[in-house]
Amino acid sequence: MRSQRIVHIVSCHAEGEVGDVIVGGVAAPPGATLWEQSRWIARDQDLRNFVLNEPRGGVFRHANLLVPAKDPRAQMGWIIMEPADTPPMSGSNSLCVATVLLDSGILPMREPLTRLLLEAPGGLIEARAECRDGKAERVEIRNVPSFADRLDAWIEVEGLGSLQVDTAYGGDSFVIADARRLGFALRADEAAELVATGLKITHAANEQLGFRHPTNPDWDHLSFCQLAAPPERRDGVLGANNAVVIRPGKIDRSPCGTGCSARMAVLQAKGQLRVGERFVGRSIIGSEFHCHIESLTELGGRPAILPCLSGRAWITGIHQYLLDPDDPWPQGYRLSDTWPGGHC
């Protein structure tokens, strides 16, 4: 068997969302900070294409590159690669990374509780893993500072007319719209229509509202549309279903950790969620993230929250991605039957 490249991957999913972890075969990219390293990955595209494009990947897949942390307090760093973006942070991917680090023995597991400090491109996060019999059974993430940006703003959306939305940041940037007002029950059989609607809303919100992170001027767009049900209480606990539409055209199978963080920032800003109060985010496949606001803070002089979310992740496979020197598609390919806007 011959190959001019071997990339070692542990496959994982967190509450339904795939987050593969690259554990070997790739050198850390250039950059003085983890953010600079992630920008190099985003510009270069070589690794992104190799692991995310067909025949090795697909639009449903995310990949996470383990790298040495730049912050001396952190035990590991990682760079997130989503189908269209290389974002500051991801909740489901952080759960996959923490689980792979512990379940595979890359970092030592201490039962019943292991604490990790990890560095994402968007900042430090703390992971607290409940562990038993060699398995990280549930991981809680203390996320980066999150904030509401625009509340109850109006936009004009093609085919939908005037629509009231919120925008917020939870480690990534979101426009949040009321799914019920758009006629959605947030069922799995609505997935294709949810994607089409969400992409229209994201496009309109970027054009008409825009977004700029207060301390990271590089992050100047809205990434996702969160189509969310109104919050309601079950057994006294506030929660809501959602479908987060990810470019170029898929739905997050998990409840979306950065999306739940952004939603909690909006709910707190509107006086609907208190510090310490539980919030349950539910996905289109019925999986859950259990969340709360740990404390209030500020970011770049604006009010913010420190959100926490917890969920489960499971390793699904171990792979070695190879590249035969005669393979005519070393960067892979994307076709629009499954990858919107894709081309060979």
From Swiss-Prot:
Q: Show the Gene3D superfamilies listed in the entry.
A: Diaminopimelate Epimerase, Chain A, domain 1
- What lineage, starting at the top, does this entry show? Bacteria, Pseudomonadati, Pseudomonadota, Gammaproteobacteria, Pseudomonadales
Gene name?
lhpL
Query: In the UniProt entry, which residues are flagged as the active site?
Result: 90 (proton acceptor)
Family (UniProt) = Belongs to the proline racemase family.
PANTHER family listed in its UniProt record: BIFUNCTIONAL TRANS-3-HYDROXY-L-PROLINE DEHYDRATASE_2-EPIMERASE, TRANS-3-HYDROXY-L-PROLINE DEHYDRATASE
What does induction of this protein depend on? Is up-regulated when the bacterium is grown on trans-4-hydroxy-L-proline (t4LHyp) or trans-3-hydroxy-L-proline (t3LHyp) as sole carbon source.
For molecular function, the Gene Ontology terms on record are: 4-hydroxyproline epimerase activity; trans-L-3-hydroxyproline dehydratase activity
Record's InterPro entries? Answer: Pro_racemase_fam
What's the protein here called? Bifunctional trans-3-hydroxy-L-proline dehydratase/2-epimerase
Record's catalysed reaction(s): trans-3-hydroxy-L-proline = 1-pyrroline-2-carboxylate + H2O; trans-3-hydroxy-L-proline = cis-3-hydroxy-D-proline
Detail which positions bind substrate: 91-92, 252, 257-258
Entry function: Bifunctional enzyme catalyzing both the dehydration of trans-3-hydroxy-L-proline (t3LHyp) to Delta(1)-pyrroline-2-carboxylate (Pyr2C) and 2-epimerization of t3LHyp to cis-3-hydroxy-D-proline (c3DHyp). No dehydratase activity with L-proline, trans-4-hydroxy-L-proline (t4LHyp), cis-4-hydroxy-L-proline (c4LHyp), D-proline, cis-4-hydroxy-D-proline (c4DHyp), trans-4-hydroxy-D-proline (t4DHyp) or L-serine as substrates. Displays neither t4LHyp epimerase nor proline racemase activity.
Recorded source organism is Pseudomonas aeruginosa (strain ATCC 15692 / DSM 22644 / CIP 104116 / JCM 14847 / LMG 12228 / 1C / PRS 101 / PAO1)
Q: Which UniProt keywords apply?
A: Isomerase, Lyase
Matches recorded under SUPFAM superfamilies: Diaminopimelate epimerase-like (SSF54506)
The EC number(s) given in the record are: 5.1.1.-, 4.2.1.77
A Pfam family matched in the record: Pro_racemase
